[in-house]
């Protein structure tokens, strides 16, 4: 399993950007081009090497994520508990116990724990118990400092579902979503390393990855859409206005 590491003990803007680029480059098929653009496209679903491991090396320990390479869905994470035992927590319908052993060999089968809620944002948000504002991940914010704080909430601690869910919401957005959307990657580097308030555009991007990918795949020529599109933050006519980092795999270009 390919492992990509982000050092958060002494991070820099450049390190974070190249980390996101490495995720993107690991899953892309350089031969695939959609809509006459140069936007990276995920390769066809792999038969081997289905997962990617991401190590988030915080100043006080490492927590790791497991991602599906065919869509960058976060399917599991690995953290030490309060007895210094490696535990792997996973979404059962996204990865099997045997596959989990290949991603996180540090955790024995006895130390694999099923996450009892769904892997979709709404389920994770409910378990994060966000009380302010929209009660969604938007209220948590984003940023390197926040990622470090959220890692500390799950590293070398007894499991607390609220802290786990908050860590997942922040980590998913700063890894997989940043790889899909340069807009998010750029916000993190612009505010580096500080925590910043998320905005509606971030959320609209995150729920529109499929829609945007399909529009570029099926209704775009030389980077220009055949009509105006509105993905929730104003009309766009050119694909480059979307600052996309990675498109969903939709087959060979038509």
Swiss-Prot record:
Taxonomy, superkingdom: Eukaryota
Reported tissue expression: Expressed in seeds; most abundant in the perisperm.
GO terms under biological process: defense response; negative regulation of translation
EC number from the UniProt entry: 3.2.2.22
InterPro entries the record matches: Ribosome-inact_prot_sf, Ribosome_inactivat_1/2, Ribosome_inactivat_prot, Ribosome_inactivat_prot_CS, Ribosome_inactivat_prot_sub1, Ribosome_inactivat_prot_sub2
GO molecular function, one term: toxin activity
Catalysed reactions, semicolon-separated: Endohydrolysis of the N-glycosidic bond at one specific adenosine on the 28S rRNA
Keywords from the named record: Hydrolase, Plant defense, Protein synthesis inhibitor, Toxin
Pfam families listed in its UniProt record: RIP (PF00161)
Similarity remark: Belongs to the ribosome-inactivating protein family. Type 1 RIP subfamily.
Other remarks in the entry: Thermostable at 68.9 degrees Celsius.
Function field: Exhibits N-glycosylase activity. Catalyzes the release of one adenine from a ribosome. Acts as a ribosome-inactivating protein and inhibits protein synthesis in a rabbit-reticulocyte lysate system and in various cell lines (in vitro). Induces cell death in Huh-7 liver cells. May contribute to the protection against plant pests and predators or play a role in regulating the death of plant cells.
PANTHER family in the record: PTHR33453, RIBOSOME-INACTIVATING PROTEIN
Protein name as catalogued: rRNA N-glycosylase sapovaccarin-S1
Taxonomic classification: Eukaryota, Viridiplantae, Streptophyta, Embryophyta, Tracheophyta
């Amino acid at each position: 399993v390919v492992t990509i590491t982000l050092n958060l003990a002494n991070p820099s803007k450049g390190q974070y950007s190249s980390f996101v680029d490495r995720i993107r480059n690991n899953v892309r098929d350089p031969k695939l081009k959609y809509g006459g653009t140069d936007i990276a496209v995920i390769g066809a679903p792999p038969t081997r090497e289905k997962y990617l491991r991401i190590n988030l090396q915080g100043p006080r320990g490492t927590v790791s994520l497991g991602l599906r390479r065919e869509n960058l869905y976060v399917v599991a994470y690995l953290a030490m508990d309060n007895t210094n035992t490696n535990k792997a927590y996973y979404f059962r319908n996204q990865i099997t116990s045997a596959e989990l052993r290949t991603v996180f060999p540090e955790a024995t089968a006895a130390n694999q724990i099923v996450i009892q809620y769904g892997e979709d944002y709404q389920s994770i948000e409910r378990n994060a118990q966000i009380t302010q504002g929209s009660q969604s991940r938007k209220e948590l914010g984003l940023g390197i400092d926040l990622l470090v704080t959220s890692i500390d909430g799950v590293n070398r601690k007894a499991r607390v579902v609220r802290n786990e869910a908050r860590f997942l919401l922040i980590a998913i957005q700063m890894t997989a979503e940043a790889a899909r959307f340069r807009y998010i990657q750029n916000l993190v580097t612009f505010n580096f390393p500080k925590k910043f308030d998320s905005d509606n555009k971030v959320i609209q991007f995150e729920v529109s990855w499929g829609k945007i990918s399909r529009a570029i795949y099926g209704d775009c020529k030389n980077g220009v859409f055949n009509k105006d599109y509105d993905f929730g933050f104003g009309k766009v006519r050119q694909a480059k206005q979307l600052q996309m980092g990675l498109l969903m795999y939709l087959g060979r270009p038509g």
